[in-house]
Amino acid sequence: MISFGTFLLMQSPSARSSKEIYARGVEMAQAAETLGFGNVWLAEHHFSTYGYLSRPAQLATYIAAKTTRIRVGTAVIVVPLHHPLVIAEEIATLDLLSGGRLDVGLGRGYQPYEFERFGLELESGRARWEESVDILLKAFEGRPFTYDGKLFKIPETTIFPQPLQQPRPPIWITAQSPESVEAAVRRGFNVLTGGFGVPIERMAEFRRLFDRLVGEFKPPHPLRVGVQRAVYVAEDHADARAAAEEARWNMRVTLSLRNQYERVERGRAIPVPAPKEPDTDDLLDRFLVIGTPDTVIRQIKRIEEMVGITHFNCSFWFGDMEHARVMRSMERFAREVAPAFR
């Protein structure tokens, strides 16, 4: 059975106020709990209107205090941008304050634009990632440890507090490349793939690689696979096509920031057209989950068949879509789509 979550990037092409963007995010998280979603996942981005959410653990703590059941998750903490001991302390604190409702999403990051402004190089991210994850796992063992790496030298240290979930909260890795899939399976972490700009056939390739690597590494417990997609439950075909064009903003900015042809003007992310950009029909077929309720059900079942998922993460808020329209789509999904998967 598929579990459903919702994802908050908290972008604003029109550069709305931070107060408005955060109020929208909190309202969506509370609505997600009321509507029966199992998770709310929070991104981490910096220095542009592509994402106002720079401290996902802080917002997750606030959301946890405003809810009682829904699990909160980071999707993701960009590990190389932080000291691993600080990450460990934040994760443990959030897990305690949420009553053990935390899922931890970790990632290497993909935007040179962000890394440069922290005085880092994206190319160094892989080495920082590997050592940081080593340290995180040691920190969650609850006993003194040392670490002697190339990048981090840690004398005997014990982390306080320790997380409520033992031996640690579930860890998910965002995987947009074969290397990330391998890193997740090798460590015994769950995999979350998809996102803007990743076609369905690419996700199916990742699943085949995942299955092969599970056979090679033989993790000690079953691993979960999830997919994240822009989702909109439309009134009709014209409404669906209009929503797809809103999602195009996210795809353009994502790809431009990933591939270093971005335009950011006074913090405002500009949607630069991508080379060989898919047309609207192609977006709807291969990149998005947008359409009438029956269409959305068919699209998710297609992903389930091709990718073999146990978790589906809905990005309901994308582009500059009006808040009321986002909330209507979210409510229709809970009422008319989710029951088909129970």
Where are these regions (language model features)?
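Active-site mouth loops of central-metabolism enzymes
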Residues: L8-Y22, I77-L85, Q165-A175, Y232-A234, ...
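Hydrophobic faces of well-ordered beta-strands that scaffold small-molecule active sites
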Residues: F4-T6, V40-L42, V72-T74, L102-L106, ...
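An alpha-helical appendage that flanks or caps ligand/catalytic pockets
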Residues: S124-I159, E201-I309, A340-R342
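Internal, glycine-rich beta/alpha segment that forms the wall or movable "lid"
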Residues: I2, H83-F189, I200-H221, E265
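Short, acidic/polar
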Residues: K19-A31, E90, A175-E182, T295-I303
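Glycine-enriched alpha-helix->loop->beta-strand junction motifs that scaffold or abut catalytic
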Residues: K66-R69, S98, V185-L192, G308
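N-terminal beta1-alpha1-beta2 module of alpha/beta enzyme domains
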Residues: M1-V72, Q166-P169
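Conserved, mostly hydrophobic/aromatic
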Residues: F4, A32, G36, E44, ...
